């Protein structure tokens, strides 16, 4: 297996970290999770072979530490051992050093300085209290004594806030850890103390939440030497307690007394090897125990994992690169050239697109909803047409109103025939009712044009120039409102025109004779039939002849009703308000029904006419006019101020986003080049 695969991932991590992004691509990495005081720091230092991690009480690791170990042979070509002084302390040498990504080019040969820099960089982001931050620190260590490996050291899980710790510190750490270990490409290194119940391990519990089958979790058992006499971890190693696909590795760490006494890691690793080789439970499997085996195992697991996921990583890098390149293209380059020409081109493009959207020729036609001109057609043929067809003239005009108008139009002498005056009065009143829905149609079309305007102003170019967008909106809205005035006037004139002349010879109008025939056919009584013989019964009784007194009530009786003879003889003056009575004579019934038929017939003609002509008027005065003159209006208004520099001032969001996209593209191009060589 080629160790350079791990270096590839390290290079990708650095490429993405330079733009401040850690989650752009899900890279293979080993994440370390554990409870506090489980011995995690000692495990990592044993793998490195150096003391370099901050130590103390409470939460010491307060930022993720991406630890990149690079195996680098010594300059002499020999595998130099880490030297110790007379007190057993590790000595620094020129073949081992550390480098921080935030301090490029600066080498730390003294590992105590590395610890100090970790503390300093942590406090720079989190302060000197016990707050935490998810922004990682990148540390690369070169040494001939390490295997090429990358580990992400995460803050230890805690339960109860201590001292100045935030009350929700447990939640903060849990969310941070889950953010790292929930990625499918993350190998979880769960560090657990062997002298505690494994079922209560916080690290394993959290790992099982995101990896319930234990497919990408490897367990590390620390403090094996501190277990009660007669107990061991053989059952755990055999997978009989909590099985993990990648298994467990037992290790021995330095105790607190050893650390305080500056016991070298080289000596501690030798003691670890002797412990496992001489222990009755582990002697036969000593080669699978200890820190050196753990490092080799992690190295092999990570390399296999990288090899398996590398094709997917290449695909994701290329997809992300295409995405950010497209966004960068939509944001456009920094404007170059004459600003007046730029504004002219924007006006031309906007007006052309406005026409295509209204005409339904846009390249971005939706398959899920109506848009543009289709919505205008819906207003014309569904909302407006159905709206005026639903208006019933007899919603407001009752039969009694019709009779009253009939009598009023007759003047002082009762009319022998039904005149046209009453018909025209009622029809004109009802035609006037069609004005409001017609004007409402104009308003709805205005709303649709504004909707199209807002749709066009959502284009990336207008997000780039917010002041120009505001000016476009103001000018076009004012233009639409100017278009509404002559449109409303024309529509009102059309309604008034229909009411100014009642064309009773219209070919579709029902004639008086036809209306009378329809009413008589509806009112004709069927001839009774003998149920036995089936023949018509002709011996009907002759209806009584009306007396002069009863016939005299055909007209006036409906107003005055019946009165006693004494009051009639007194000839009292009529009341201030006269209303028709509810009693109708046969003639009144017939006249009322006939005029209702005539009103409905003519009103339907007018409704059909307006349903056809109002959309045509709006199309002429608003839609067609706006398509032809919107460009002239924009040119006139925008060029009047000559404030092109101000209009083309880019928004801070656009400038910042372009910078971010440029950095992303540069980073992804670098990443693409890295993986293309593998």
From Swiss-Prot:
SMART domains: DYNc, GED. Signal peptide: none annotated. One of its GO terms (molecular function) is membrane scission GTPase motor activity. It holds the Pfam family GED. GTP binds at residues 34-41, 153-157, 222-225. One of its GO terms (cellular component) is membrane. Residues 222-225 are annotated as: G4 motif. Residues 78-90 have a biased composition (Basic and acidic residues). Residues 60-62 are annotated as: G2 motif. Residues 153-156 are annotated as: G3 motif. Residues 71-96 are annotated as: Disordered. InterPro entries: Dynamin, Dynamin_GTPase, Dynamin_GTPase_CS, Dynamin_N, Dynamin_stalk, G_DYNAMIN_dom, GED, GED_dom. One of its GO terms (biological process) is mitochondrial fission. Residues 34-41 are annotated as: G1 motif. Residues 252-255 are annotated as: G5 motif. Residues 592-678 form the GED domain. Keywords: GTP-binding, Motor protein, Nucleotide-binding. Residues 24-311 form the Dynamin-type G domain. Belongs to the TRAFAC class dynamin-like GTPase superfamily. Dynamin/Fzo/YdjA family. This is Vacuolar protein sorting-associated protein 1. It comes from Schizosaccharomyces pombe (strain 972 / ATCC 24843). The gene is vps1.
């Amino acid at each position: 297996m080629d160790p350079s695969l791990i270096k590839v991932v390290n290079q990708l991590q650095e490429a993405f970290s330079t733009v401040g992004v850690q989650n752009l691509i899900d890279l293979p990495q080993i994440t370390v999770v554990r409870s506090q005081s489980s011995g995690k720091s000692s495990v990592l230092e044993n793998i490195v072979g150096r003391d370099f991690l901050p130590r103390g009480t409470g939460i010491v690791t307060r930022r993720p530490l991406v630890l990149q170990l690079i195996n680098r042979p010594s300059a002499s070509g020999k595998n130099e051992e880490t030297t110790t002084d007379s007190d057993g302390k590790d000595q620094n040498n020129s073949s081992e050093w550390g480098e921080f990504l935030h301090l490029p080019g600066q080498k730390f040969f003294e590992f105590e300085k590395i610890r100090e820099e970790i503390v300093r960089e942590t406090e720079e982001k989190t302060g000197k209290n016990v707050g935490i931050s998810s922004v990682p620190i990148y540390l690369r260590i070169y040494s001939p004594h390490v295997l090429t490996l990358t580990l992400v050291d995460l803050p230890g899980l805690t339960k109860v806030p201590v001292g100045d710790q935030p009350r929700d510190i447990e939640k903060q750490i849990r969310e941070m850890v889950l953010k790292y270990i929930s990625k499918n490409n993350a190998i979880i290194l769960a560090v657990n103390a062997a002298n505690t119940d494994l079922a209560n391990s916080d690290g394993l519990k959290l790992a099982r939440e995101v990896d319930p089958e234990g497919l990408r979790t490897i367990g590390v058992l620390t403090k094996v030497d501190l277990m009660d006499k007669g107990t061991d971890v053989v059952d755990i190693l055999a997978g009989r307690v909590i099985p993990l696909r990648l298994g467990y590795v037992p290790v021995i760490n330095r105790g607190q007394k050893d650390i305080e006494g500056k016991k070298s890691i080289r000596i501690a690793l030798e003691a670890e090897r002797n412990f496992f080789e001489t222990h009755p439970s582990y002697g036969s499997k000593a080669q699978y125990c200890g820190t050196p085996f753990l490092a080799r195992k992690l190295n092999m697991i990570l390399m296999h994992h990288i090899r398996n996921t590398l094709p997917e990583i290449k695909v994701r890098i290329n997809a992300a690169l295409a995405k950010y390149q497209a966004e960068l293209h939509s944001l456009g380059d920094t404007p170059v050239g004459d600003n007046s020409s730029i504004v002219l081109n924007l006006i031309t493009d906007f007006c052309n697109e406005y026409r295509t959207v209204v005409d339904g020729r846009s390249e971005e036609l939706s398959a899920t909803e109506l848009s543009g001109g289709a919505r205008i057609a819906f207003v014309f043929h569904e909302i407006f047409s159905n709206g005026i067809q639903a208006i019933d003239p007899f919603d407001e005009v009752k039969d009694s109103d019709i009779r009253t108008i009939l009598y009023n139009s007759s003047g002082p002498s009762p009319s022998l025939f039904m005149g046209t005056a009453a018909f025209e009065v009622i029809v004109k009143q009802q035609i006037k009712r069609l004005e409001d829905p017609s004007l409402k149609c104009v308003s709805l079309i205005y709303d649709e044009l504004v909707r199209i305007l807002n749709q066009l102003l959502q284009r990336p170019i207008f997000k780039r120039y917010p002041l120009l967008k505001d000016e476009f909106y103001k000018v076009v809205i004012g233009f639409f409102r100017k278009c509404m005035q002559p449109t409303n006037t024309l529509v009102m004139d059309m309604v008034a025109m229909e009411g100014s002349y009642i064309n009773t010879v219209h070919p579709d109008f029902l004639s008086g004779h036809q209306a009378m025939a329809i009413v008589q056919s509806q009112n004709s009584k069927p001839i009774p039939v003998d149920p036995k013989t089936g023949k018509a019964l002709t011996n009907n009784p002759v209806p009584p002849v009306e007396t002069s007194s009863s016939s005299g009530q055909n007209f006036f009786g409906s107003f005055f009703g019946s009165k006693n003879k004494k009051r009639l003889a007194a000839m009292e003056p009529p009341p201030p308000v006269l209303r028709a009575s509810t009693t109708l004579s046969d003639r009144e019934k017939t006249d009322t029904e006939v005029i209702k038929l005539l009103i409905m017939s003519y009103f339907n003609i007018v409704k059909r006419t307006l349903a056809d002509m109002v959309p045509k008027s709006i199309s002429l005065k608003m839609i067609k006019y706006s398509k032809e003159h919107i460009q002239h209006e924009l040119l006139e208004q925008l060029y009047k101020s000559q404030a092109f520099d101000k209009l083309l001032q880019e928004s801070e969001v656009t400038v910042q986003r372009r910078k971010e996209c440029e950095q992303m593209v540069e980073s992804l191009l670098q990443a693409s080049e890295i993986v293309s060589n593998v």
